[in-house]
């Protein structure tokens, strides 16, 4: 036979490779469409001739062979439906089998088991009681050595099925179908249907454990379909694709009765005598009342479970194991316990347990006989102080709480009155947020709120905004003990702080009028202090049970007129123009926090609770948030709070030794204060201007030691800070370069800093006079616009008296009697900077 020049199926005598592949795919689609419609083409003889020549065509590449194989799969379905005469059918099937061997091993291909319907029906009866089996499309058996298998089948519209039926994939291990392990998918095998992976049956979405039949209706096509299994099975499996229906459970299931084991008389004293057993009438699956008590036919226990709960659970995940003894109990092994069913019908609804004796008698135990009373869990609102004040006693289990920390669970506290917090005041227009305390629970781990903080570093005529990351190390010791604005706070006020108004500021005008009548006396809170301090000392092992009384302050928070303690008072800066960084310590590690750039007058309140700390006194004039360094057990913790305080320079020391050191009286440009992070430090510049030093230390139970700091630092200074023995030094632009430790910086005087040089050669430095002179970077004169050319530097030091007097005369910054003016600086001045090169000589738009 010779193929005609033009065929009605689209084939011609001569084809190139691409045209041949496209024609094969088109012919396969036409055959599949005819099979789906259950129709037979008219010119079968011509089609048989074309297919015979296609199979005999020499295919050199794998792509062409795959296309021809796809066409032959459709032709095989047509042969099975009787499209061709007997002789042509045998010839085509022989050619197809020959080509099939090139894509699959012939020894691994098994048509089907002897009775697939019987085996699948048994599996459905045992493990899929809600599934009804329909027409089986294809079934075959995979052997343990099988690695790659293919099976084709066809679907037509005239197949016996209902529109509601679905097509499911069944994978069953044939060695033992009595347990649910037989429906576990082989973990090393992936199934593909028409080239697409089947959900939960491929290696990328494999599901362990027993599986339900997989719905593959969306992956099928009318006509020929191809199922592929790739991987090692490791056992004998039955794979089948069949129509199935999902049916509901019967209202009255036909179940067999449970046969109780016979009680054998005991003649030996060594036999165990069974006593009464307590049986729960609640299902162990849902903890609800049992409706139909069932258990497995091999179960030996008396406890039953509900039939409906058990079946519904296994229809979602068919594990089919007893919830009490974990034995395999498939659907056909479920038995009804008629004895317990009779008990459920006779007892009332309030019965929770029954006691069944060995002779069959039983007795009801109701819920009222329970000795254990459930304690509801209490959720506390950390923002509501009444959450803990109204907390009642909590019942605990002594057996559970043996190894837990012994702490009191009953808190008897009272809300602080508003009058106690504010004190008498004549100003009725002051914002309420100025009197709000930081309110935190003593059980909170994050004791203080954390705000994003930035540092505005002055660099030439620009400000560089440097974000800082806050790292809080919480420990049992660092509990919520924030300070209020009162210099003599009570422990009740210390324990309660309010984070809601964090960031509230007070204008400078109101801050300057803030009267000392708002100061809360410790004596007013002593009635509420003893029980709280006893609780605190019980938890943290303190001996002191009450803070010593503190003197009252009645005028502008000005405590300068009080009699000083044995400590010698030193001047403290009164005005800080830019954010300043102070020391923060968490658990023997110091943490440096930058204050927000919008804060014009930061202030530090170093507080020490029972430890030794080196604190720096604080400036006196504050119009915006301040920094509260708090020390718990020898560790310093500085937190920023938003209280508007004008003249508060108090160093509080409770039960420890405080080392107070004044800060420089005038710092006009950049300055970096040392900080330590667990033995490691990093320097970051800050802009500050301190013109009015003032110190008012108050000491409670300690011996402060105050030492002066340099009186004037007029230019940027780099202060290296030790990181566990490693110094990381960062130069500020246009400033002098120096290297100090924390204690060396505190002991600096103008006399010993004028000609300071490092004691040893610094690592990485290049000495002059060597062959590397050309690599030394020399400072250059800063370039300024012609319109703003600064005058030549007057001298290496200048007298800032005029500048200081200008700020003293400013009405927003009150001056006390002990304010001092900044002296002249003995440090060298950078080239190009003099009186006009200071920060205050810059235009306002560059601040």
Curated annotation (Swiss-Prot):
Where is the region Interacting domain (IND), required for interaction with MOM1 and PIAL2? 113-271
| Keyword Cell wall biogenesis/degradation appears in the UniProt entry | no
Q: What outcome is recorded for mutants in which this gene has been deleted?
A: No obvious growth difference under standard greenhouse conditions. Altered sulfur metabolism. Reduced growth in high osmotic pressure (mannitol) and in response to abscisic acid (ABA), but enhanced growth and fitness in high salt (NaCl) condition. Abnormal steady state levels of SUMO conjugates in various conditions. Released transcriptional silencing of target genes (e.g. LTR, SDC, ROMANIAT5 and At5te35950) but unchanged DNA methylation levels; the expression level of these genes is higher in plants lacking both PIAL1 and PIAL2.
Entry protein name: E4 SUMO-protein ligase PIAL1
Top EC group:
transferase
Gene encoding the protein = PIAL1
| Pathway given in the UniProt record | Protein modification; protein sumoylation
Binding locations of Zn(2+): 299, 301, 322, 325
Q: Does the keyword Nucleus apply?
A: yes
The EC number(s) attached to this protein equal: 2.3.2.-
Pfam families xref list: zf-MIZ
Quote the function comment for this protein.
Answer: Together with MOM1 and PIAL2, regulates transcriptional gene silencing (TGS) independently of changes in DNA methylation. E4-type SUMO ligase that promotes SUMO chain formation in a SCE1-dependent manner and thus contributes to a pathway for proteolytic removal of sumoylation substrates. Involved in stress responses (e.g. osmotic, salt and abscisic acid ABA) and sulfur metabolism.
